[in-house]
Amino acid sequence: MARSTGKDAQALFHSLRSAYAATPTTLKIIDLYVGFAVFTALIQVVYMAIVGSFPFNSFLSGVLSCVGTAVLAVCLRIQVNKDNKEFKDLPPERAFADFVLCNLVLHLVIMNFLG
Amino acid sequence: MVNDGTFYFDEKLVNMREQQGPLATTSSVVRGLTAFSSVITESLNLTGDKILGIAKFFLGIGIPGDTKNFFDQVDSLACLENNRVSIPLILSLPSTVISLTKKDSLKVKVNTVLGSHAPPLTVTLVRAFSSSARDNSIIENQELKFDPQDAVYFLDDLPASFDVGEYIFVFKMLVQDSEQQTVYATGTLTQVPIYVTGLIKIENAKIAVLDSDLGSVETQKKLDLAGESTVSVSANHLQKLRLSFQMSTPLGNAFKPHQAFLRLRHETKVEHTFVVGSSGKKFEITLDFLGLVEKFFYLSGRYDIQLTVGDAVMENSLLRDIGYVELDLPEPPENASRPPPQPVDPYTRYGPKAEITHIFRAPEKRPPQELSLAFLVLTILPLFGFIIGLLRLGVNLKNFPTSAVPATFAVIFHLGIAAVLLLYVLFWLKLDLFTTLKTLCFLGVFLMVVGHRTLSHLASASAKLKSA
């Protein structure tokens, strides 16, 4: 039984990889961006775990900037994805403009909270 | 006429504006009297007592406050000094204290009002009696001898029965030349209070601690009140403290001083004072601590003992710390009264206080700088990973518009975003929110315009591509 689950997991993984290769490049860029943001957040959490959370507001602002920008990127991905029926009429440039604007606002707040 | 032998005139309150006091009134009477008597040939019928009374009034008021009164006083005395009615003679004593130890003699001076010499007189001490026993006169009719060098009348030795105390001496003066007796006013009798002082013998002084129930002596120590030595005793609240001594005059009589106090002072400066009672020559005070426990506020510890014995006629009055007593009192109950607060030295109360140094909050433990820098580098790494990933994906920059106008807009768009991010960095470093928001407004509006242009251009380009 374990061997079959192991084999199933591998098969699942392979199919996932092949399916992913079919996604358009733009979406891959956005995915990469999300990964980068999350990874940065993780590194900050590890740092805080090591040295303690003395300027807690700084830690929060750092992590939240990463998480916020990841969330905005995910929203962008949803809006830009052509397979998504809901946002068919929304031009991708408009979505990108929203993404940029929201990021700027987010980063203003983050900079204020950074201290 | 007043009881102390002075005599003066006062004015009836007729006119408020022109009111003069008794001094001015009497002096104007004297001036008139002496001026009148100097011009008439007959003598005025005036008793010497009245003139003497007026003279004593002027001499008895001290030095008046204002110049007019002072002038009146001196002028009247000058009139009286040499007037034709009768010249008053004043008897005075240079010292009213006679010390038995120094063997002082009684000295008496007789002068006119302004201090000039009197004619030869016979001064007699009529009576001398103790102020406490007025009927019993010790000296009677003793004539005083005259010392021409100092111009004093003196009495050489006082009789042996003169003990210390307060006395009243009564003198009488008589002008030796009988013809001149009407010229001078000597008065009848003059009373003078005299103090006779001497060394009082204090002996047999002892301090003892007694057992309260039986009255038996537990410790007894001799005191040397004349010297400097101190004693120390200890007692608890079940015992009594007894201090006793004997006092006698130089002649051996019993002596009751004006002040005989015993004071106990605690380390905390709380004091208690007691009067030493006497019977004849024996002075004794017993402090029963059982009854005094509450009065002493239940304070145990070391009490300094101070004895005070004094009187005006005692030449060896003493105020001395004679030692201390270690007192052991029980614990105070709940509702015992607290001792009264002792006066605080005003310099310590209003003086500078201890300096307060502010203790700052200990700063938080910061990580070592190398660790922080390492993690900074680690955090930047994902960015590079992102860029590398982008390149690997083969991101195309082909869609970047090449024609002039849209290109500029695209470039300006990217520059605009970079400018906003730079503004944020400046905001973190040194700007405040208000300037940042103001600048952001301008930049934001600018960016929106440019962005709209660029993106709409891109959108139209992709739409053209789609439709084509």
Curated annotation (Swiss-Prot), chain A:
Annotated metabolic or biological route of this protein:
Protein modification; protein glycosylation
The record lists its disulfide bonds as: none
Q: Which residues lie on this side of the membrane: Lumenal?
A: 53-55
TM stretches of this protein? 32-52, 56-76, 95-115
Q: Which UniProt keywords apply?
A: Apoptosis, Endoplasmic reticulum, Membrane, Transmembrane, Transmembrane helix
Write down any Gene Ontology CC term.
oligosaccharyltransferase complex
Extent of the signal sequence? none
Task: Tell me the membrane topology, using the record's own terms.
Answer: Multi-pass membrane protein
Please give the residue ranges for the topological domain Cytoplasmic: 1-31, 77-94
Q: Give one GO biological process term.
A: protein N-linked glycosylation
Entry's Pfam families? DAD
Q: Where does it localize?
A: Endoplasmic reticulum membrane
Q: According to its UniProt entry, what is the function of this protein?
A: Subunit of the oligosaccharyl transferase (OST) complex that catalyzes the initial transfer of a defined glycan (Glc(3)Man(9)GlcNAc(2) in eukaryotes) from the lipid carrier dolichol-pyrophosphate to an asparagine residue within an Asn-X-Ser/Thr consensus motif in nascent polypeptide chains, the first step in protein N-glycosylation. N-glycosylation occurs cotranslationally and the complex associates with the Sec61 complex at the channel-forming translocon complex that mediates protein translocation across the endoplasmic reticulum (ER). All subunits are required for a maximal enzyme activity.
Report quaternary structure and partners: Component of the oligosaccharyltransferase (OST) complex.
Regarding protein family, the annotation reads: Belongs to the DAD/OST2 family.
Question: What is the official name of this protein in its record?
Answer: Dolichyl-diphosphooligosaccharide--protein glycosyltransferase subunit DAD1
Its lineage opens with: Eukaryota, Viridiplantae, Streptophyta, Embryophyta, Tracheophyta
